[in-house]
């Protein structure tokens, strides 16, 4: 009896899953235990029902992978889908359930084909690509879309298979974002042995379909193509695979479902541009294939893409490979021209280039992909996009501008990147997923941009610090003297040329060169005499208006904008006294640096005043010694003018290091806000100090400088208020040059020494009169002007 039962039992073993039998019966390959005689009657009805079950409907035929009647072709986009997209998905660890059609019979899913009317899997798509089944890339993308959608329709959202499908779909969308924008047909010549290869491929593809099959593997899209309510059987709840995807990812992928319905309404007449919908923030918030291709859009007719194929350059027919448009001859020459035009990136732009590479890297691709390419508003049906966004921007444009060296500095680069993000925020609602992606990417950008290295800057004006050592103050004042007036610089160049030529003449023994050199120097001497005579006669006839000018200048100082001060300076008097200071520095050695500070009004304050002071230009300097006042209190409370503050800052820098401690003590004693500051390094802003503090500083500085043997205030005198004084100083400067030229004449040749001695003695007399004139009042200065002019006439006659 037992022997008769066993053969009848075995045929039903393969259908145990469908019958709902116990796990022992369902397990394939398990030995059937011998039933006892007790249950003989129980098993006999089962035997009778086996033939009926064998009549159950089998799986429907798989989707076709080739159709001779349906024209297919090879395009650049289809080739990209085959070689790049399919290759990446096929090798993924979650791809195994999607590599072959769903075997509903084997998996015990009797309702699968009732719910899913159009099954699709990656194996079918792969074989269709290999057989050139598709006419356009949009058809292939529609098949991917169907596969993912089927999976979402049939299974519960919490099932592992759904999470696996979402992961694959995300990778699919990222890859499609980099697909060529314009679809072009590629002409492929079939080699002679293609039939053998095709047979091998068919055999290989046939073996793929016999692989292990898994339940409920379908397809992805948040907009369901089929509306029947999903009836989810409990048999699909647990899929034996270790990988589980986090729930935040699931939420992020599901969150943008409803808004994408609007995108899917894009006109289906542009299937090759549909892929761009995946790429852009304003168009598709979450990576969903609805943006790629509207569900239910008709397949592209065979002739729809013919014009684009006609644009291709002529192909070589003897090659079996798909030939791409020529990219060697023309781009090479262009690259050579571009490389010659491209300059070296600055340090900051190199950092920006690194930021750009990071934004385009795979590390951030999950939320950066919508920003890779420009928004294709027409393909995505965003008809108001360019009305709202006037200046579109994307990372590919930024990259192109960076490669073409269009960015002059890092600020221009940052402006374009921030424009891209602001466009996203402007066009999309705040709760849109693409806005969240933009914020995440912008965080990456701002974090990296904050680490921007500083460009090596030219040394600028130093802030005022009373703790600066005198040597540092000297160097800053000397740097300011280099920016003196054009007149003084030209005169200095003449003198330097003279000195250089003098050295050359000394080194040469030729008598002719010495004679020629002597003639040149005498010519220069004559020109200096003429200039001196003209200056000494000019300003004497003009009346004095010193007091009126002082009052006018005070009023104008309060009213004028800082930028107009330089104009007044040109109107009120010549820039003659400026050349005097460089001369003094040559003659006086170390003390000359203090005089140099005054050589250029705009920059002289850099060593001795606050950051505010250098912005103004000096008009005139007040009398150095404080004038008499009725009372000491009145003097202390009298506010200090800008020129006085500037002069005070210059004087402080002239003090030796041991005197600066007292300056700090005066400031800290009279200014409560600075009492806690570090005495080693204290910054003085003269605009914030009290008038009494400034007057006390002025008194102390004057007392220190008055003790010195050289008279420092004669240097400040040239910045006088009247044109007479300016002309006088110009004349003295010319006398000084005359003396220098005379010295050169002496060194050049011995015979004319008598004449040069005579000239030098007269110049020395002039120098004595200059010292006496500078220490006297304004009245005596005018008298010294006449005396110096008489000296000049003597020197001319000599």
Curated annotation (Swiss-Prot):
Every NET domain range: 630-712
Low complexity biased stretches: 284-297, 772-792
Basic and acidic residues compositional bias, start-end: 315-331, 637-648
Residues bearing the modification Phosphoserine: 36, 297, 300, 304, 631
Ranges for domain Bromo: 73-179, 343-452
GO cellular-component term (any): chromatin
Chain positions found as N-acetylmethionine: 1
Free-text comment about domains: The first bromo domain specifically recognizes histone H4 acetylated at 'Lys-12' (H4K12ac). It also specifically binds histone H4 acetyl-methylated at 'Lys-5' and 'Lys-12' (H4K5acme and H4K12acme, respectively). The second bromo domain recognizes and binds histone H4 acetylated at 'Lys-5' and 'Lys-12' (H4K5ac and H4K12ac, respectively).
Name used for this protein in its record: Bromodomain-containing protein 2
Lineage: Eukaryota, Metazoa, Chordata, Craniata, Vertebrata
């Amino acid at each position: 009896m037992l022997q008769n039962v066993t053969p009848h039992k075995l045929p039903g073993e393969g259908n145990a899953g469908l019958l709902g039998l116990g796990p022992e019966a369902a397990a394939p390959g398990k030995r059937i235990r011998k039933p006892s005689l007790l249950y003989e009657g129980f098993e006999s009805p089962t035997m009778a029902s086996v033939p009926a079950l064998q009549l159950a409907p089998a799986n429907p035929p798989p989707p076709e992978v080739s159709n001779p009647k349906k024209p297919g072709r090879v395009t650049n986009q289809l080739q990209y889908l085959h070689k790049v997209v399919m290759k990446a998905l096929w090798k993924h660890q979650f791809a195994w359930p999607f590599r072959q059609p769903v075997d509903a019979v084997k998996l015990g899913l009797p309702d699968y084909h009732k719910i899913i009317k159009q099954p699709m899997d990656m194996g079918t798509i792969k074989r269709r690509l290999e057989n050139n089944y598709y006419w356009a890339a949009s058809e292939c993308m529609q098949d991917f879309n169907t596969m993912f959608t089927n999976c979402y329709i049939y299974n519960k959202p919490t099932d592992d298979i759904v999470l696996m499908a979402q992961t694959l779909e995300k990778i699919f969308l990222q890859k499609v974002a980099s697909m060529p924008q314009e679809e072009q047909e590629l002409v492929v010549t079939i080699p002679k042995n293609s039939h053998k290869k095709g047979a091998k491929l068919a055999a290989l593809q046939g073996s793929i379909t016999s692989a292990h099959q898994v339940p409920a593997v379908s397809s992805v899209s948040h907009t369901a193509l089929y509306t029947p309510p999903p009836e989810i059987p409990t048999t699909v709840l647990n899929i034996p695979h270790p990988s589980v995807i986090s729930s935040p990812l699931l939420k992020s992928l599901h969150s943008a479902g409803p808004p994408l319905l609007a995108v899917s309404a894009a006109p289906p007449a542009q299937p090759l541009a549909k892929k761009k919908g995946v790429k852009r923030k304003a168009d598709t918030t979450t990576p969903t294939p609805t943006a790629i291709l509207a569900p239910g859009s008709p397949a592209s007719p065979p002739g729809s893409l013919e014009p684009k194929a006609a644009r291709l350059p002529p192909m070589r027919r003897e090659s079996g490979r798909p030939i791409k448009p020529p990219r060697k001859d023309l781009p090479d020459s262009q690259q050579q021209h571009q490389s010659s035009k491209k300059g070296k990136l600055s340090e900051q732009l190199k950092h920006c280039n690194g930021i750009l590479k990071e934004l385009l890297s795979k590390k951030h691709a999950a939320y950066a992909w919508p920003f890779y390419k420009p928004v294709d508003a027409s393909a995505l049906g965003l008809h108001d996009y360019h009305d709202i966004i006037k200046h579109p921007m994307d990372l590919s444009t930024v990259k192109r501008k960076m490669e073409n060296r269009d960015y002059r500095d890092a600020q221009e680069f940052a402006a374009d990147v921030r424009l891209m993000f602001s466009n996203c925020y402007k066009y999309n609602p705040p709760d849109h997923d693409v806005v969240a992606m933009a914020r995440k990417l912008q965080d990456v950008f701002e974090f990296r941009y904050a680490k921007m290295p500083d460009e090596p800057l030219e040394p600028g004006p130093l802030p005022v610090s009373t703790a600066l050592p005198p040597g540092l103050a000297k160097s800053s004042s000397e740097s300011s003297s280099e920016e003196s007036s054009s007149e003084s610089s030209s005169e200095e160049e003449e003198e330097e040329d003279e000195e250089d030529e003098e050295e050359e003449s000394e080194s040469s023994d030729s008598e002719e060169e010495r004679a020629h050199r002597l003639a040149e120097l005498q010519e220069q001497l004559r020109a200096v005499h003429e200039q001196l005579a003209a200056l000494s006669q000019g300003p004497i006839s003009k009346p004095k208006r010193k007091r009126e000018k002082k009052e006018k200048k005070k009023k104008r100082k309060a009213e004028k904008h800082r930028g107009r001060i330089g104009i007044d300076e040109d109107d009120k008097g010549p820039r003659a006294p400026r050349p005097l200071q460089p001369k003094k520095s040559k003659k006086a050695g170390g003390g000359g640096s203090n005089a140099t500070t005054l050589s250029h009004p705009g920059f002289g304050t850099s060593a001795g005043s606050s950051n505010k002071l250098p912005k103004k230009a000096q008009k005139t300097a007040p009398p150095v010694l404080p004038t008499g006042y009725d009372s000491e209190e009145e003097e202390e409370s009298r506010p200090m003018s800008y020129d006085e503050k500037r002069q005070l800052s210059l004087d402080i820098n002239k003090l030796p290091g041991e005197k600066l401690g007292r300056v700090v003590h005066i400031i800290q004693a009279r200014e409560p806000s600075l009492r806690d500051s570090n005495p080693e390094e204290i910054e003085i802003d003269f605009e914030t100090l009290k008038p009494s503090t400034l007057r006390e500083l002025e008194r102390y500085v004057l007392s220190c400088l008055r003790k010195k043997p050289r008279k420092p205030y004669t240097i400040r005198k040239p910045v006088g208020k009247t044109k007479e004084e300016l002309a006088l100083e110009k004349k003295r400067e010319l006398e000084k040059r005359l003396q220098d030229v005379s010295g050169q004449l002496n060194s050049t040749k011995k015979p004319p020494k008598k004449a040069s001695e005579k000239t030098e003695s007269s110049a020395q007399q002039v120098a004595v009169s200059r010292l006496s004139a500078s220490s006297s009042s304004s009245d005596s200065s005018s008298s010294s002007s006449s005396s110096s002019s008489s000296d000049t006439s003597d020197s001319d006659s000599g």
